[in-house]
A protein has these predicted regions:
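Extracellular glycan-interacting surfaces
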Residues: 1-314
Length: 314
């Protein structure tokens, strides 16, 4: 069995690849944002804000598309790559590498109520731009969902031609992820708790039981379970990661088993990665925690990562 590689992207210092006991840096000195799978065991990455790059199985990187727009996220449906921007647009990458804007996304009902998230810190208003934070599709490829921050989770069933809103805008969604096998199950991390859909993202229920705080920022599926991170707010000095069965209706419980009850800052959007029995969590403090036995035990793999932006296991 091939040992999986854990990729941890950072906003300022490239990307770090961990395979077994070895580790090395790639794209040094570059800003690497959202990572996503291309569906064939390779990684896609937003590099320096304007390039969509592909990592081959041997670790070599190539640029497959560029844009004048500030890029924020990507997702794949079949062989089609969709890219989100920091001005809340959706682009589709053509076979030639051109990025074509999906005009239908500009007509989402309620778009005029979207807003950029912000907070008052030391007398200054700070926060990310209004943008597309995550993109996902149901396992059968029928439904495309994007997480607008802040604008809910628009949903398309016709390849992005038309869109309908889901989840209240004020819920402040931070990440949306579709189940890798069951096309009905979708989860989202929001400032009001964990949101779960059992009809392909058409409707949602809110789960809060067991959380120490409601501000959820990252979600992932792992086998039959859901992982979700929570903190008091975006700038909290400590956070926690919880786990619960997809089919269960009980409390979310702290992961434990070597993953600290309180981690160093939040686990932000895209910073929980899972693949087979391997899981990885990167916190804002730059710690990377890894489990290779489906969460039976965890250990801290490294420290000092500079502003982690994304985790992907390939």
């Amino acid at each position: 069995m091939t040992t999986p590689t854990i990729l941890v992207a950072t906003w300022r210092d490239g990307l770090f690849a961990f395979t077994g006991e070895t580790a090395h840096q790639e794209l040094a000195g570059q800003a690497v944002g959202a990572l996503s799978s291309d569906g064939h065991g390779r990684a896609l990455a937003i590099v320096d804000g304007h390039s969509l790059c592909l990592r081959a199985h041997n670790g070599a990187w190539s640029t497959i598309a560029t844009s004048e727009s500030q890029l924020s996220s990507s997702g794949v449906v079949g062989d089609t790559i969709y890219v989100g921007t920091d001005d809340a647009r959706i682009l589709r990458v053509s076979p030639t590498g051109a990025m074509d804007q999906l005009d239908g996304f500009d007509a989402v009902p309620g778009r005029d109520t979207w807003y950029a998230g912000s907070a008052l810190i030391d007398g200054q208003l700070v926060g990310p731009p209004l943008g597309i934070r995550s993109i996902t599709a149901t396992s059968n490829g029928v439904v495309l969902l994007v997480n607008v921050h802040v604008g809910g989770v628009p949903r398309s069933t016709d390849g992005g031609m038309t869109w309908q809103p889901t989840i209240e805008v004020a819920s402040d969604v931070h990440e949306v992820v579709a189940h890798p096998i069951d096309p009905d199950i979708v989860i989202a991390a929001a400032a009001i708790g964990l949101c779960i859909s059992r009809d392909g993202g058409a409707t949602w229920t809110l789960e809060r039981e067991g959380l120490h705080a409601l501000h959820c920022s990252a979600v992932a599926f792992w086998g039959n379970d859901i992982l979700v991170s929570a903190a008091a707010h975006h700038f909290a000095t400590e956070g926690a990661v919880y786990r619960r069965s997809i089919d269960g209706h009980g409390s979310l419980v702290p992961v434990g088993a070597g993953l600290p009850r309180w981690i160093d800052g939040i686990v932000d959007t895209r910073c929980i990665g899972t693949h087979a029995s391997t899981g990885a969590v990167a916190d804002r403090g730059g710690n990377l925690y890894v489990s290779v036995n489906a969460g039976g035990t965890w250990s801290r793999r490294t420290t000092g990562l500079s502003a982690p932006s994304s985790v992907l296991i390939v």
